[in-house]
Regions:
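Thiol/selenol-based redox catalytic cores and closely related redox-interacting motifs
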Residues: 42-118
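Short active-site neighborhood of thiol/selenol oxidoreductases, capturing the structured segment around
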Residues: 1-18, 33-34
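Short, solvent-exposed mixed-charge patches
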Residues: 124-126
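Short hydrophobic alpha-helical module
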Residues: 30-33, 57
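Sequence context surrounding c-type heme c attachment/ligation sites in exported
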Residues: 1-2, 22-30
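Short active-site loop/helix that positions an aromatic residue
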Residues: 121
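Residue-level recognition of beta-strand->loop/alpha-helix junctions
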Residues: 38-40
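Aromatic/hydrophobic pocket-lining residues that form the small-molecule binding cavity
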Residues: 17-20, 82
């Protein structure tokens, strides 16, 4: 049912990222596949180290879901993958989270409800 793929730069401490993540099934039901990249808004700090532990865990989806419930990783890791995600975000002009990048490279800053994102994706495809 995939019609669109978006990449979301997110931070595990971001309120609107939490809302977006809670609605990921609604995005999927509308044909929008959501992929995540880490973008710790405060740079390479403790949050970045927590995000690295999530992204490098044996089951990153489970680890992210747990973090979204407040169960943050106990083990912190040096942010290598997260640093690459962050640097890419900076190059693309990401200034905050969530930031949504479409498959055509368009940057949508901020949270959009599932139906609003679908409308924006349809409009940009024309």
């Amino acid at each position: 049912n995939e019609k669109y793929v978006v990449t979301v730069f997110m931070d595990i401490t971001c309120h609107y990222c939490h809302i977006l993540h809670q609605q990921v099934k609604e995005y999927n039901d509308l044909g929008i596949t959501v992929r995540y990249l880490a973008f710790p808004r405060a740079g390479m700090n403790e949050t970045a180290r927590q995000m690295e532990a999530i992204w490098t865990s044996k089951d990153p989806v489970f680890a992210l879901n747990e973090a979204e419930k407040g169960n943050l990783p106990k083990e912190l890791k040096t942010p290598n993958i997260v640093k690459r995600h962050y640097d890419l975000g900076v190059q693309l002009g990401v200034k905050g989270t969530p930031s949504i990048v479409t498959s055509t490279g368009e940057l949508i800053g901020g949270y959009l409800k599932p139906k609003d994102l679908l409308a924006a994706l349809k409009e940009s495809a024309q």
